[in-house]
């Protein structure tokens, strides 16, 4: 008798995606990050659902409702900090996942890669709107500054900003709609994840060597399920340590002050995972130029498949490209540090240099190095 998981219409889909899926035997632990992202999304949706039961999206009560969750709701503090720090873990996994895609040439599956970029924008939008909900000082001023960037769009900018705000400033209408979208978007993200996997399973996973692996496959279960469970346990351990020992490590102390439109914080900055893009935005003195650079810092990922000039798919056997890749990682860490610093000398010039380096490495140096490595193969 055939196993039910291979015959049942619904179980068959799950079986082909999670049990009997053939995976290249050389796939390393770097490929764990996709599974970890699914776990992060599940944690965020569950904790967010329970937080939404106690949260009120009204400017008069939002800050107090978050305080009430932490003080009076059973394990409310755990829910709140799991959700806040879970977002940080989400972005750590997300950036590792993108980095691994760049390193191993996964962007050659352009449909999967492009859906991934849409997912990145959706997750960033969700995280931004979530940061506004506690209605602290940084929530209010962050929302004001970031939404105000849209006013740089010619002709329609100002009207667009007021349409998003639902008035002439960030107020009750803004908070209510941000809460509605923050609740809705994770489910849209979950649907996009299914599409992402659908496109991935059309082609099958690539592998670190970059050569066809059809003759050398292993079933997903038990080999990769065990590996992924280990990764999830490691991530949950890290998240638990963060939540239980230093829950405010990655937050901003200004967000414990209720939002006050009459008092501007000395240094407005977003959450740490947006600081690299914020640094690129600030490095250009022109408003429209800064906004374009901000958007392009993410959209540049979409042109990476077009700039692939190497005869090899992955960077595994390309040491010069590897050096450039790690230089890009170091550059992003520098930008993240600069984004959290005040706008003064020497941070301004460091930020500008790091921003130029970011685009130069991706758009110029990587394709040029790949072409040089092609010539080296002839020696």
From Swiss-Prot:
<dbReference type="InterPro" id="IPR030689">
    <property type="entry name" value="Cytochrome_b"/>
</dbReference>
<feature type="binding site" description="axial binding residue">
    <location>
        <position position="97"/>
    </location>
    <ligand>
        <name>heme b b566</name>
    </ligand>
</feature>
<feature type="transmembrane region" description="Helical">
    <location>
        <begin position="178"/>
        <end position="198"/>
    </location>
</feature>
<keyword id="KW-0408">Iron</keyword>
<dbReference type="InterPro" id="IPR048259">
    <property type="entry name" value="Cytochrome_b_N_euk/bac"/>
</dbReference>
<protein>
    <recommendedName>
        <fullName>Cytochrome b</fullName>
    </recommendedName>
</protein>
<keyword id="KW-0999">Mitochondrion inner membrane</keyword>
<dbReference type="GO" id="GO:0006122">
    <property type="term" value="P:mitochondrial electron transport, ubiquinol to cytochrome c"/>
</dbReference>
<keyword id="KW-0813">Transport</keyword>
<dbReference type="Pfam" id="PF00032">
    <property type="entry name" value="Cytochrom_B_C"/>
</dbReference>
<keyword id="KW-0830">Ubiquinone</keyword>
<dbReference type="GO" id="GO:0045275">
    <property type="term" value="C:respiratory chain complex III"/>
</dbReference>
<dbReference type="GO" id="GO:0046872">
    <property type="term" value="F:metal ion binding"/>
</dbReference>
<comment type="function">
    <text>Component of the ubiquinol-cytochrome c reductase complex (complex III or cytochrome b-c1 complex) that is part of the mitochondrial respiratory chain. The b-c1 complex mediates electron transfer from ubiquinol to cytochrome c. Contributes to the generation of a proton gradient across the mitochondrial membrane that is then used for ATP synthesis.</text>
</comment>
<feature type="transmembrane region" description="Helical">
    <location>
        <begin position="113"/>
        <end position="133"/>
    </location>
</feature>
<feature type="transmembrane region" description="Helical">
    <location>
        <begin position="347"/>
        <end position="367"/>
    </location>
</feature>
<dbReference type="InterPro" id="IPR016174">
    <property type="entry name" value="Di-haem_cyt_TM"/>
</dbReference>
<feature type="binding site" description="axial binding residue">
    <location>
        <position position="196"/>
    </location>
    <ligand>
        <name>heme b b566</name>
    </ligand>
</feature>
<dbReference type="GO" id="GO:0005743">
    <property type="term" value="C:mitochondrial inner membrane"/>
</dbReference>
<keyword id="KW-0679">Respiratory chain</keyword>
<dbReference type="InterPro" id="IPR005798">
    <property type="entry name" value="Cyt_b/b6_C"/>
</dbReference>
<dbReference type="InterPro" id="IPR048260">
    <property type="entry name" value="Cytochrome_b_C_euk/bac"/>
</dbReference>
<feature type="binding site">
    <location>
        <position position="201"/>
    </location>
    <ligand>
        <name>a ubiquinone</name>
    </ligand>
</feature>
<keyword id="KW-0496">Mitochondrion</keyword>
<feature type="transmembrane region" description="Helical">
    <location>
        <begin position="320"/>
        <end position="340"/>
    </location>
</feature>
<dbReference type="InterPro" id="IPR036150">
    <property type="entry name" value="Cyt_b/b6_C_sf"/>
</dbReference>
<keyword id="KW-0812">Transmembrane</keyword>
<dbReference type="GO" id="GO:0008121">
    <property type="term" value="F:ubiquinol-cytochrome-c reductase activity"/>
</dbReference>
<feature type="transmembrane region" description="Helical">
    <location>
        <begin position="226"/>
        <end position="246"/>
    </location>
</feature>
<dbReference type="InterPro" id="IPR005797">
    <property type="entry name" value="Cyt_b/b6_N"/>
</dbReference>
<feature type="transmembrane region" description="Helical">
    <location>
        <begin position="288"/>
        <end position="308"/>
    </location>
</feature>
<keyword id="KW-0479">Metal-binding</keyword>
<feature type="binding site" description="axial binding residue">
    <location>
        <position position="83"/>
    </location>
    <ligand>
        <name>heme b b562</name>
    </ligand>
</feature>
<comment type="subunit">
    <text>The cytochrome bc1 complex contains 11 subunits: 3 respiratory subunits (MT-CYB, CYC1 and UQCRFS1), 2 core proteins (UQCRC1 and UQCRC2) and 6 low-molecular weight proteins (UQCRH/QCR6, UQCRB/QCR7, UQCRQ/QCR8, UQCR10/QCR9, UQCR11/QCR10 and a cleavage product of UQCRFS1). This cytochrome bc1 complex then forms a dimer.</text>
</comment>
<feature type="transmembrane region" description="Helical">
    <location>
        <begin position="33"/>
        <end position="53"/>
    </location>
</feature>
<keyword id="KW-0249">Electron transport</keyword>
<keyword id="KW-0349">Heme</keyword>
<feature type="transmembrane region" description="Helical">
    <location>
        <begin position="77"/>
        <end position="98"/>
    </location>
</feature>
<dbReference type="InterPro" id="IPR027387">
    <property type="entry name" value="Cytb/b6-like_sf"/>
</dbReference>
<feature type="binding site" description="axial binding residue">
    <location>
        <position position="182"/>
    </location>
    <ligand>
        <name>heme b b562</name>
    </ligand>
</feature>
<keyword id="KW-1133">Transmembrane helix</keyword>
<keyword id="KW-0472">Membrane</keyword>
């Amino acid at each position: 008798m055939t196993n039910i998981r291979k015959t049942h219409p619904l179980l068959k889909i799950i079986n082909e995606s999670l049990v009997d899926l053939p995976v290249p035997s050389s796939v390393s632990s770097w490929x764990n990050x996709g599974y970890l992202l699914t776990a992060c999304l599940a944690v965020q949706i569950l904790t967010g659902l329970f937080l939404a039961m106690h949260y009120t999206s009204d400017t008069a009560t939002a800050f107090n409702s978050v305080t009430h969750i932490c003080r009076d709701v059973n394990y409310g503090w755990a829910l709140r900090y799991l959700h806040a720090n879970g977002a940080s873990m989400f972005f750590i996994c997300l950036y590792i996942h993108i980095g691994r895609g760049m390193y191993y040439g996964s962007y050659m599956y352009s449909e999967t890669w492009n859906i991934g970029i849409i997912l990145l924008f959706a997750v960033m939008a969700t995280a931004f709107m979530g940061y506004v909900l506690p209605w602290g000082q940084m929530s209010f001023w962050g929302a004001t500054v970031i939404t105000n960037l849209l006013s740089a769009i010619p002709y329609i900018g100002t009207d667009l900003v007021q349409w998003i705000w639902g008035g002439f400033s960030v107020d009750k209408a803004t908070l209510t709609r941000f809460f509605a979208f923050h609740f809705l978007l994770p489910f849209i993200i979950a649907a996009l994840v299914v599409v992402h996997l659908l496109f991935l399973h059309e082609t099958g996973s690539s592998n670190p060597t970059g050569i066809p692996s059809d003759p050398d496959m292993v079933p997903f279960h038990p080999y990769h399920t065990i590996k992924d469970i280990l990764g999830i346990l490691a991530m949950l351990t890290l998240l638990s340590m963060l939540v239980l020992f230093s829950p405010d490590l990655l937050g901003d102390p200004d967000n414990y002050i209720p939002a006050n439109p009459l008092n501007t914080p000395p240094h407005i900055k977003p959450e740490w995972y947006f600081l690299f893009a914020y640094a690129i935005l600030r490095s250009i003195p022109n408003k429209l130029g800064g906004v374009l650079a901000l958007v392009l810092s993410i959209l540049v990922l979409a042109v990476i498949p077009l700039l692939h000039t190497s005869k090899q798919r992955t960077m595994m056997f390309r040491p010069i490209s590897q050096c450039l890749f790690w230089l890009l990682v170091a550059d992003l860490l520098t930008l993240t540090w600069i984004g959290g610093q005040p706008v003064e000398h020497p941070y301004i010039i460091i930020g500008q240099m790091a921003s130029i380096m970011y685009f130069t490495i991706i758009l110029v140096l990587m394709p040029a190095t790949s072409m040089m490595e092609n010539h080296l193969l002839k020696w």
